[in-house]
Amino acid sequence: IDKLNTTVDSVSQNDDYIAIRVAGEIPRYEIFCSLEHATALWESLSDKTRATNSAYWDYLNISNGLPFIDSNTREEFVPQMANMELINGVSFEKGCYTGQEIVARTHYLGKQKRRTYPIKIISDTPPKAGDQLATGTSTENQYTGTLVNVYQTAKNEYEALAVIQIKAAESDKLKLKDADAEITVLELPYPLEDQK
């Protein structure tokens, strides 16, 4: 690709490649091409870029508030809970998909009670996607949030994305439901729309 677009969500393409600019301060691209072209591209970029592992890519997604829903959390959330409409992950203007009526109703009636937030966790027990969050006032069978993605940043320290009840995220009483942990809600790199 001769020239890559730098605008978030923009697409650059030629006959051999398609590259999509991913959100975040550090420029990242998802590149789609054949294996043959991927090998050539890798060699041409090796002196201009720094290779990292997929875990670092996951960390950058967490840092940029971009959730990745996997088998631990699928079918747990409507798109708005994962902030999808805020990161161009869902459109209310077009498309047809399973559950669209519920998603649109939630959007247009403004009854959103949960959102995705970045959090910092300090815990001796490693947290994982799908773990539940609670508050000090939660009963044994209640939970106020679910971990979506987790990345270990240091010994016993983690950054994560979690879908959390808006009221619970505004309190200072979050905890992992099944482990002793200190949890701090961090700021998203994009604004949440009016939380009705």
Which residues are covered by each model-predicted region?
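Acidic, low-complexity central loop/insert segments
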Residues: 1-64
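Short, low-order "capping/linker" segments at domain edges
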Residues: 1-13, 67-76, 193-196
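Short, catalytically relevant binding-site loops at active-site mouths
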Residues: 38, 59, 66-69, 109-111, ...
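Glycine-rich, small/acidic residue-mixed loop/short-helix segments
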Residues: 82-90, 104-196
